[in-house]
Amino acid sequence: MKYVYLFSEGNKDMRNLLGGKGANLAEMTKLGLPVPQGFTITTEACTRYYEDGKKISEDIENEIFENIKKMEEITGKKFGDKENPLLVSVRSGARASMPGMMDTILNLGLNEEVVEVLAQKSGNPRWAWDCYRRFIQMYSDVVMEVGKKYFETLIDKMKAEKGVTLDVELTAEDLKELAREFKEEYKSKVGEDFPNNPVDQLMGAIKAVFRSWDNPRANVYRRDNDIPYSWGTAVNVQMMAFGNMGETSGTGVAFTRDPATGEKHLMGEFLMNAQGEDVVAGVRTPQPISHLKEVMPKVYEEFTNICATLENHYHDMQDMEFTIENEKLYMLQTRNGKRTAKAALKIACDLVDEGKITDKEAVLMIDPRNLDTLLHPTFDTNALKDAHEIGKGLAASPGAAAGKVVFTAEDAKKAHENGEKVVLVRLETSPEDIEGMKASEGILTVRGGMTSHAAVVARGMGTCCVSGCQEIVMDEENKRFTLGGIEFTEGSEISIDGSTGRIYKGLIPKTDAAITGEFERIMAWADKYRRLAVRTNADTPKDAAKARELGAEGIGLCRTEHMFFEKDRIAAIREMICSDTAEERENALAKIEPMQQKDFEALYEAMEGYGVTIRYLDPPLHEFVPTEEADIKLLADSQGKTVEQIKNIIASLHEFNPMMGHRGCRLAVTFPEIAKMQTRAVIKAAIAVSRRLNTKITPEIMIPLVGEVKELKYVKNIVCETADEIIKNENIDMTYHVGTMIEIPRAALTADEIAKEADFFSFGTNDLTQMTFCFSRDDAVKFLGAYYYKKIYENDPFAKLDQKGVGKLVKMASTLGRETNPNIHLGICGEHGGDPSSVEFCHNVGLDYVSCSPYRVPIARLAAAQAAIKSEK
């Protein structure tokens, strides 16, 4: 197996092997552009490094030095030679651009003897010693993890002693003294002398790149961006080009288009007599790239021609790094540039208009996840730089929120009514908190994962939420908490970012969401190519209307229980729960029925004839009963019972494992009158709206938590008898569908039997994931961190569908269901319906639709189109 490739041996299609940087250096070499030559150590060598117990094997080391010899032949220089040394840079380069990977090491190959000869021969001793002190600092920081700050302190001390403000004002003698001090600092921190042998330096740097693939920052970034650990990183070893040789040398970065707005103009900065990170370090003010035209017109002309060549070649906006050495231009890197979501849409549309790409390619260019930032407010970028970050939780629902801390839903509601902006901070939220959640700018919880109550409800409402911040020390009773060493009480100011999970002290200004015309164009192209329909999970007319505005083609999940928690309804529900007889229950349900009917009518109207799937009552009854003494007394008085009797009823509802207890279809089996009432409300609402709007409505009734076909058959009979009677009495031609959620593994395993009784399956992947993995979505956050660290799991299975296990059940149930009912309609309504990788899986399995939170509808539409286009290839 070949582990090392010269740049002249690769191309852009080898990024899996050579990494993004290596593949693009090879491609630029192939295009005849001025690239300092070198070689790439492959991602497979990185994988082997970990397999061999974090060692570089002898055969790979031999191959590295064979390629060093080839570099010597190409450059006419010799690695480790005093008279004519080959100096190199070492850079990491995974196949996907990854912040958090190892920083670059420049000027590798220098030692005290080499630098003395270099100073003499070049006639530029300042340059030689500047290179050496930079190398010592970079190697110490990057390879040996001695922090930059120690060396920066020594530089600042030297500048103060010499009475200068800039590094470039230090003389050769000053820099020589700095190099000596740096080596002393290195020895004091590491306990050994700085390595003089270039071979040891090179192998140390290569190992450091491989090690950085497994550092905490890289692991977090990989998990957030769905990058597998197995990919590994490549290493690029490249001949040095020096931008610090004087005023005819320099270094810079540039974009072929504006990465913030997408406007078509060259944008970037450069700095003369500089190297490495000087451009972005902020010590000296860089010049705009347009100024290079005045400083070096020929170099500028060559550079702009190269920019045009690269953008035309890659058919995308390029982010490039370059160095000028004595008026000679060298290209060090090109890659598809990172950009804002707004810029991504504009660039894609402009490239189509310029004839450089097709609309299909434009659809594939956009990362669906980035659309979130277009649909929600974000923090002002400049203000964020100065913000005081105090902690981090899970990025549960995107957007930015800033306001005063409140600890109860009631307080949130009151503050909102008084015109105050608040952030609701809770240990965890429950359905009782809905009103307060609606009134809050954002929600912060100590417990719970990506599919906890807080996360799911917040996403549905489009409200910012950070969940599972276990660093918070909460004192709910006294309304205070501590985070990042700071105590927050009621009224303290806080800001949370639901897109990153970051939490800040104080109020940060926000920028409003802005949807542009390019958004509509991209979405229209996506709709042209996708096969999957996209529905929404919505419980209120407001959510349904927002989802329609964002392109939803119906409601895939309406959770009826969320309608019961408003004050005028909860009393009737509690009355029903505490009834002694079926007659009493029916009387209580009769009060709820018109309210439910009104809700359903509003949803049917908002959906304008598109399908609406209504899930019958699902949660265990204990979630509806009062917990406060005053509420218990109120309920007792209204029912003519004693407080003690009500408390006994509440106690009788207690379950050791309520999520696997008396809930879902089991409620309808034990209390059929609940299913009858909900059926009447569904059918009457459909009839009323179909007559009012003169449109055909086909109600879709979904029975939850079915694990045995006889359960479905029993509840379905109740539904059909009730519905048929109403339709007959109303003398209307109306059809309706009865289906079930597949959320219990047994339902997936017996889907062929269940399909005979169902018009549709909707995979409830939140519960299906819980029951397949056997852990709670609210509690898993406690141990998932350890599982990520130990490489047991790479992703949160509640955020990204587990395709090996849960996915296998979905696939099996789809196949079995279609065997006995070829016309069965298949969809997914768990939170995975808005995750791009899960949507792609749904497309490949052959589902008919996905359903997700309203604000994730555009993400699902784009992801579905990308899945369809990819499957054509």
Model-assigned labels for residue ranges:
Residues 1-387, 413-416, 420-423, 430-435, ...:
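Nucleotide/phosphate-binding sheet-loop regions of phosphoryl- and nucleotidyl-transfer enzymes
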